[in-house]
Amino acid sequence: MAIRSKAWISLLLALAVALSARAEEEPAAAAEGEAVLTLDVDSFDEAVAKHPFMVVEFYAPWCGHCKKLAPEYENAAKALSKHDPPIVLAKVDANEEKNRPLATKYEIQGFPTIKIFRDRGKNIQEYKGPREADGIVDYLKKQVGPASKEIKSPEDATALIDDKKIYIVGIFAEFSGTEFTNFMEVAEKLRSDYDFGHTLHANHLPRGDAAVERPLVRLLKPFDELVVDSKDFDVAALMKFIDASTIPRVVTFDKNPDNHPYLMKFFQSSAPKAMLFLNFSTGPFDSFKSAYSAAAEEFKDKEIKFLIGDIEASQGAFQYFGLKEDQTPLILIQDGDSKKFLKVHVEADQIVAWLKEYFDGKLTPFRNSEPIPEVNNEPVKVVVADNVHDFVFKSGKNVLIEFYAPWCGHCKKLAPILDEAATTLQSDEEVVIAKMDATANDVPSEFDVQGYPTLYFVTPSGKVTSYDSGRTADDIVDFIKKSKETAAPHHHHHPGATGIREGSRAEPVKDEL
């Protein structure tokens, strides 16, 4: 399927749910309290402008994880209201129709999403802390304090630096000058992701050389080489150094929540991605892990990220990529052009050779597609990857196509509505309503599918428009009648790069992830 950065984010949110160690039962929603501000599209901007630091939860009333968060968020808000100065927590029902513009503006891809608004909205960052009251309180107290803390002694370092987390320290001869200013700027930008400190003495730190030429940035981490240094204080270079150094050479995809931040970075990266999936509990795991780690070391100078995933924890990824458990052990490469390369039933001693073939351009991409249906006489036509271009772009017709997932509740609700609309338009030979299972078929690059259901309207001339109107049969029929072009049966073509996409996604969140 077409995989763009926002589509990856949708996958990441699904992975975050899969990695949650909390129980899945639905708790009762928290009683409405006064500590959390309730905002809507009319009051939002005024509230942001009023508060130098404000935290906002974007939620949906039907979202189970939002219900689970509600009492914790309320209790945290009560505790933080006593902080000096008070830390304000707010919430927005992003599922309410009038508030949809806020969800679009702030790129809300799933529920709940929490964002930190600093400097009266001039600086907006993702909340990446705990989801229970005490953890929320501790995390936000850190966020409202200085972006980097001074380390004056080894005892300070012991108190601030967690051996299981990444910690970034600037080592200076004095706390002034361009290097210090740039370091503090980067610390402010990345403070929701990492903890920062600054010191005059490298020997206060638990790892790394004590005798250093200052200034220097030292990054301490719980994986690979444990400590890396850089002397480049250019802001862009420092950001790049941190980005490259804060992901393991091989990311592990299992149920350990400590690995979740590395998974987020892995899937957010624009670099090609190699993913090895197998059963972690079986005997060959150790030999595969050793061989895969050696391959990652051998190709560390190539622009590619490596992940090893446990079958049990990777069901969301299997569903997303259309993989099957009986194909494991398997290795999948997703490159920057959305091409995929797959080797199923791979042996540990085949990994390096297969990766060399990839880098040498000798592998053939593969495409997920269900079989083309032999019978396709229902009102809503079934389209698969192997015939989508012929059906949508070369038919000379106006095609409304839905990209759906079989498990998606909103898709199930929409199905009879599309059937009704298709039946109403059945006598119009210039119009077709179709659907594609986006979990079993690769979506063409002409369509940006970020969630389910996603609908697009394609005209005979190749104009591609996202459908963001109402979800009744009458709404759909009216839209098609107003938007359709006169069919051109003798002018069939594939628009390719010249296809025009119009419209914006008014409903970025399509289902609870």
Swiss-Prot record:
One of its GO terms (cellular component) is endoplasmic reticulum. One of its GO terms (biological process) is response to endoplasmic reticulum stress. Residues 24-145, 366-485 form the Thioredoxin domain. The record marks 131 as: Lowers pKa of C-terminal Cys of first active site. Glycans are attached at residue 279. The record marks 471 as: Lowers pKa of C-terminal Cys of second active site. A motif (Prevents secretion from ER) lies at residues 510-513. It comes from the Eukaryota. It catalyses: Catalyzes the rearrangement of -S-S- bonds in proteins. It is found in: Endoplasmic reticulum lumen. Its main location: endoplasmic reticulum. Keywords: Disulfide bond, Endoplasmic reticulum, Glycoprotein, Isomerase, Redox-active center, Repeat, Signal. Residues 1-23 form the signal peptide. Residues 502-513 have a biased composition (Basic and acidic residues). Its EC number is 5.3.4.1. The active site is at residues 63, 66, 408, 411. Participates in the folding of proteins containing disulfide bonds, may be involved in glycosylation, prolyl hydroxylation and triglyceride transfer. Belongs to the protein disulfide isomerase family. This is Protein disulfide-isomerase. It comes from Zea mays.
